[in-house]
Regions:
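Structured core elements
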Residues: 2, 9-11, 31-33, 84-86, ...
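Glycine-rich, flexible beta-strand/loop modules in the N-terminal catalytic cores of phosphate-handling
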Residues: 2-78, 166-190
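Glycine-rich anion/phosphate-binding loop at the beta-strand->alpha-helix junction
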Residues: 9, 15, 79-116
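Long, low-complexity N-terminal extensions
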Residues: 80-85, 109, 115-118, 122-123, ...
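Long, charge-patterned amphipathic alpha-helical coiled-coil/hairpin "stalk" segments used as oligomerization
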Residues: 96-116, 122-166
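Long, contiguous binding/interaction regions
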Residues: 151, 177-178, 182-189, 193-204
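Conserved small/polar residues in nucleotide/adenosyl-binding loops
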Residues: 210-215
Length: 220
C-alpha cells in the first residue's frame, strides 16, 4: 500500500492453530506484526531483531493493527485458525500505522477469499471493511493524512480507524504540548468522513485486481 511517500508491504497468512487460551473453543484469532526496514527512514534504523527486543512503539502499533482488523472478521465462523497480518514499512513518511491497517485489510480480505475458494466455503467470514487515516492540527489548521514534517510539528495528533458503515473502532487523539476543543474533534470527524469512502473504494479495487487463482497468494 502507498500513501504518498509512505509504502508498506502487507500480507496475511491463515494457520491451523490458535493461542492456548482459545484451544477447544471453536473460535479463531487474528494477530499482527509490524516492523520498519532499516532503510525506510532518512537515517538508518537498526533492526529490532538485532537489538533483541521490540520497542514500545512497535508493540503499541501491532496491538492497534490487530485490534482494528479483528473487527473485520467473524472469529466464531473462522474456527480454530489464526490469521497473521504482517506489515513491513519500506518507506516511512508519516502514517505508517494507518497505512498498515489499510493494506492489512486488503491482504486479510484476499487471504479469506482464497481460503473460502480452497475449501468451497460460503460462510460470511469478513463482516466489516476497515480503514484508517491520520489527522491533526498543524499551524492551527486541521489537516488529514499527515506526512512526517507535518506529524512531527503538529499541535494535535490523531489516528482514526473506522468501518465502512461509518462507525468508529479507534479514535486516538493527543495534544502535543497543547490543548484542543470539542470543535477540533468535530473537524477531525468531518475530514475523516469525507476521505474514508475514497479509501474504501481503493481497497475494493485492490481486492478486485487479484481475484484470479494465480494471484490469490500475492501480497498487497
Amino acid at each position: 500500500v502507498k500513501l504518498g511517500n509512505t509504502h508498506v508491504l502487507c500480507s496475511a497468512v491463515i494457520e491451523d492453530r490458535v493461542p492456548g487460551f482459545l484451544r477447544n473453543s471453536g473460535k479463531g484469532w487474528l494477530t499482527a506484526e509490524y516492523g520498519m526496514l532499516p532503510s525506510s527512514t532518512n537515517e538508518r534504523v537498526d533492526r529490532e531483531a538485532a537489538r533483541g527486543k521490540q520497542s514500545g512503539r512497535t508493540q503499541e502499533i501491532q496491538r492497534l493493527i490487530g485490534r482494528s482488523l479483528r473487527c473485520a472478521v467473524n472469529l466464531d465462523i473462522l474456527g480454530e485458525k489464526t490469521i497473521k497480518i504482517d506489515c513491513d514499512v519500506i518507506s516511512a513518511d508519516g502514517g505508517t500505522r494507518t497505512a498498515s491497517i489499510i493494506g492489512g485489510y486488503v491482504s486479510l480480505a484476499r487471504a479469506i477469499n482464497s481460503y473460502k475458494k480452497k475449501y468451497n466455503l460460503n460462510n460470511q467470514i469478513i463482516v466489516n471493511q476497515i480503514a484508517a487515516i491520520s489527522v491533526g492540527v498543524v499551524k492551527g489548521t486541521a489537516c488529514i493524512d499527515l506526512d512526517y514534517p507535518e506529524d512531527s510539528s503538529a499541535e494535535v495528533d490523531c489516528n482514526v480507524v473506522m468501518s465502512n458503515d461509518g462507525q468508529f473502532i479507534e479514535f486516538q487523539s493527543t495534544g502535543e504540548e497543547a490543548k484542543f476543543t470539542k470543535q477540533t474533534i468535530l473537524e477531525f470527524i468531518e475530514l475523516v468522513e469525507k476521505v474514508m469512502p475514497i479509501i474504501n473504494k481503493a481497497q475494493d479495487i485492490a481486492c478486485l485486481l487479484y481475484t484470479s487463482d494465480a494471484a490469490d497468494d500475492t501480497p498487497c
